[in-house]
Amino acid sequence: MWLLGLQDDGSSLLTRFLRPSGIVLAVLLMHAFRKGYQVRKKFQALKDEGIPIMKHSMILGHLEVVGKLVSSLPSDAHGDYMMMKIRENWRELFPQCTKCPPVAYIDTWPFTPPMVISLNANVSSQFTQEHSLPKAHEQKHVLYPLTKNQDLSSMEGAKWRAWRKSLSPGFSVQTITSRIPDIVEEVEDFAKVLKSKAGKDGEWGDVFSFETATTNLALDVIIRFFLDVRMNEQWGKSSALCIALQDTISRMYFFVNIANFIHYYNPWRHFKLWKNYRTLANTLTPAVQRRMDALQKDRSVKGKTLVDLIVQALDAEKAEQKVMTQDNNDHQAAELDANFVTMAIGQINTFLFAGFDTTAATLSWLFRLLYQYPEVLAKLREEHDTVLGPDAWGAADVLRRDPQLLNQLPYTLAVLRESMRYHTNVGSMRRGEPGFFLVGPPGSGPGFEGKNLPTDGFIVWDGNFAAHHDPELWHRPGEFLPERFLITDPQDPLFPPPNGWRSFSAGPRNCIGQNLVYLEAKLAMALVVRCFDIECAWEKWDLKK
């Protein structure tokens, strides 16, 4: 009887385990089918309203269409290339349209939420400038491991406005110009690193990853600018801070779906993210504490770094909270201090992330274009000879003595802006709202012109990469023509269109750090382009790998 009872108990235990598991699985499947049906119906409703969309299936949505569209791209190609593929193939994808549609509704559920991508700069201005939609939940979700969403990018409303106002002085032209000697020192190291890799006596050096070099430069510059500390990443002295930052970024997921959820929920990933955050916090907290101690001693002294501004803003916020609560007990103070540190670390981390990742990519594309277009490179070198003097290796000393010379390089700035048009970083993602509609701009063709285009339940994506290659707005968009940014006559076909250039987004939530990017890129050109010849060597790189 006892043995029989034990076997019955085991069977009963298994049954008790499997039954609720089966119920949970059934509920999840029912929820997934229900969600999928709702998403697919959402797109069918667009068709019923007469809004042109790509060929859509109630079973696969746009998965088959998008799959074919991106099949020619490398497996690790950035998602931005999808919008370029849509623009390039619009006649096949939208046979009912007479011109490229201003927006494309995309249904790739369950891999991504429903999206509407703006392919037209005038449409993008509607949700970033005329009315600034809130950031997409996914954009906040991806930052959480790095910032706990205590950062300017994740904030909304009054809190965002207060922080934007507090931090803006740190990115003003005056502040950034005052830091030119510091940044020159880091960019000078960039030139020295490239020199160490160059060949001798007119020979080519060994092949290397230029993106690695620009990434290390961007890390050194951003940390020097924000913390006033030299990291020497360019010389291979990888710090715990930079290792933790880059490892965290490599483990970020914008969309969590059936293709990556195992990796996303992997306990090792979460342990590494926790450990990386502790490393970042432990490294940055002393800098925050030093500034706080200095502020307590003398509040009249204003610092020059981002940390200074963050601490000053948090100190003012803390003082205001004390006045409002009239509660100065020790427990409350300790609690505020913990929040203080979390907010400070969150703000710093988001700027470290945004400041190096996009800048490194910008510099890599910039130098590639320069050496693809020798006539542009020749004009650039000529401008540098004229303004900075004929000694290419002495340009750093010239700029230390007279930083304002950087403002006398109009062609250099035009080259940068055209490079950022030609190869554009990721556009802003916003969250659609009930009652907010995009409106098809004049001339956008049947089905779009003047029509209300719903955003509720959609991620609204500024497809600036595609918009920058819109032949309706940009004359000769497939050509690299820096001269277009020197033209002042609005009647000239090359004149940049209003709202057309969106590399830093536009509107109240445009990139707060754009002046720093301008400075770093102009310095990189000023100190490098006359010193080296550079070419792509993919075959040699493949052999080396």
Regions found by a protein language model. Give the residues of each.
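N-terminal membrane-proximal hinge/A-helix region immediately C-terminal to the signal-anchor transmembrane segment
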Residues: W2-K148, S153, A158, A162, ...
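Conserved, non-catalytic sequence blocks in retroelement Pol enzymes and Pol-derived host proteins
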Residues: E49-I51, V173-T177, K297, P403-P410, ...
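Conserved cytochrome P450 K-helix E-x-x-R motif and the immediately C-terminal K′/meander segment
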Residues: S71, D76-P95, K99, D397-E449
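Cytochrome P450 heme-thiolate monooxygenase catalytic core
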Residues: A136-Y144, S178-L363, K379, H384
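Cytochrome P450 I-helix active-site segment
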Residues: I180, V184, W204, A240-D247, ...
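C-terminal, well-structured subdomains that either form a transmembrane helix-short loop-helix hairpin
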Residues: M343, Q347-D357, T362-S364, G443, ...
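Cytochrome P450 heme-binding "Cys pocket" and the immediately downstream C-terminal segment
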Residues: P374-V376, P497, Q514-K545
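Conserved cytochrome P450 K-helix/beta-meander segment immediately N-terminal to the heme-binding cysteine loop
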Residues: D462-D492
